[in-house]
Amino acid sequence: MFEFITDEDERGQVGIGTLIVFIAMVLVAAIAAGVLINTAGFLQSKGSATGEEASAQVSNRINIVSAYGNVKTASGTDTVDYANLTVRQAAGADNINLSKSTIQWIGPDTATTLTYDGSTADAENFTTESIKGNNADVLVEQSDRIKIVMDAASITTNGLKAGEEVQLTVTTQYGSKTTYWANVPESLKDKNAVTL
């Protein structure tokens, strides 16, 4: 039933072989565990960074407090030549640098993306002015208010006419988006400015 090995040399070789196989298995298991730990650490840091970016996109937004347009009469037609948005930080937002933001303008006859220009608003750029706070282009405190100025007369053909609307989407440096529909009133007669 049992076979007895009487030769001592054969017994030692079997024991050493088993020991070598065992050590090899332990080494393979240790290497595999190291790879798994490194992979888990990498995935954890990647997931944490992704979570922070997603959180920033959700929380670091602006709120549009109000919007108005300047009315200009040219050739007997009243149009809105400048569209203005008053903005502030959303609750819990970090500093928002409007000079690193973009505004997508989708209007009656034009679709374009506006970028920041510190000196003037034109067909491709918007500018900002401080209403309340120390910065003309960065929202630092919840109480800060900044006016975003867009040259509607340069962006569209002769400005926005009565009854027209434009979709404005402000994208901050964090990637968060705020959309506002600016609706021009049906009548602009005898007005210098109108709520949009």
UniProtKB/Swiss-Prot annotation:
<comment type="similarity">
    <text>Belongs to the archaeal flagellin family.</text>
</comment>
<dbReference type="GO" id="GO:0097588">
    <property type="term" value="P:archaeal or bacterial-type flagellum-dependent cell motility"/>
</dbReference>
<comment type="function">
    <text>Flagellin is the subunit protein which polymerizes to form the filaments of archaeal flagella.</text>
</comment>
<dbReference type="InterPro" id="IPR013373">
    <property type="entry name" value="Flagellin/pilin_N_arc"/>
</dbReference>
<feature type="propeptide">
    <location>
        <begin position="1"/>
        <end position="12"/>
    </location>
</feature>
<dbReference type="GO" id="GO:0005198">
    <property type="term" value="F:structural molecule activity"/>
</dbReference>
<dbReference type="InterPro" id="IPR002774">
    <property type="entry name" value="Flagellin_arc"/>
</dbReference>
<keyword id="KW-0974">Archaeal flagellum</keyword>
<dbReference type="GO" id="GO:0097589">
    <property type="term" value="C:archaeal-type flagellum"/>
</dbReference>
<protein>
    <recommendedName>
        <fullName>Flagellin A1</fullName>
    </recommendedName>
</protein>
<dbReference type="Pfam" id="PF01917">
    <property type="entry name" value="Arch_flagellin"/>
</dbReference>
<keyword id="KW-0325">Glycoprotein</keyword>
